[in-house]
Regions:
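Short acidic, flexible loop segments centered on an aromatic residue
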Residues: 40-59
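Short, surface-exposed linear segments at secondary-structure transitions and domain or protein termini
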Residues: 53-56, 68-78, 117-124
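Short beta-strand segments
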Residues: 6, 42, 59, 106-110
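Asparagine-centered strand-capping/turn motif at beta-strand->loop junctions
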Residues: 34-38
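Terminal connector regions
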Residues: 86-124
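Intrinsically disordered, low-complexity Pro/Gly/Ser/Thr-rich segments with frequent PxxP/GP/PP motifs
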Residues: 59-91
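Low-complexity, acidic Ser/Thr/Pro/Gly-rich terminal tails and inter-domain linkers that flank the onset
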Residues: 1-25
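Short, solvent-exposed loop/turn segments enriched in Ser/Thr/Gly
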Residues: 25-31
Length: 124
């Protein structure tokens, strides 16, 4: 199994009802879809996110699974989840990786390309 056998799509959005701009608190959600395009199952073991705000402050988040799960994703299956990210600025980015183990026992990482977290009508 190769890393390109797992396709990861992330859709971010701004949550104005949970944000407090006057207190420098901007909350974003992101929806993640992981599609297994291979002929074998793989288990998502851990995640690593690199979160950068508009002032170039970087926070790294590492942990087991996602939203408390370590899903086994079968051939042709899709696993989806949503989570959130608070920032002190109205703009930022996220990128990272997921660590998997294929049913053959071979570990591999899937890179998640950088995506933008932005309050609507905010330019940086």
């Amino acid at each position: 199994m190769q890393s390109n056998d797992m396709v990861v799509v992330v859709t971010p959005s701004y949550l104005p009802e949970q944000s407090e701009p006057n207190q420098h608190r901007y909350l974003f959600s992101y929806h993640v879809q992981v599609r297994n395009t291979s002929a074998q199952a793989a288990q998502l073991i851990s995640r690593h996110w690199v979160i950068t705000d508009a002032e170039q402050n970087v926070q790294e988040v590492k942990g087991l699974g996602v939203v408390g799960k370590q899903p086994l994703i079968g051939p042709g299956e899709v696993f989806e989840y949503s989570s959130g990210c608070p920032l002190p600025t109205p703009f930022g980015t996220m990128k990272g990786s997921f660590h998997f183990v294929g049913e053959n026992g071979v570990p591999f990482d899937v890179r998640i390309d950088e995506f933008v977290l932005s309050m609507p009508q905010t330019l940086y």
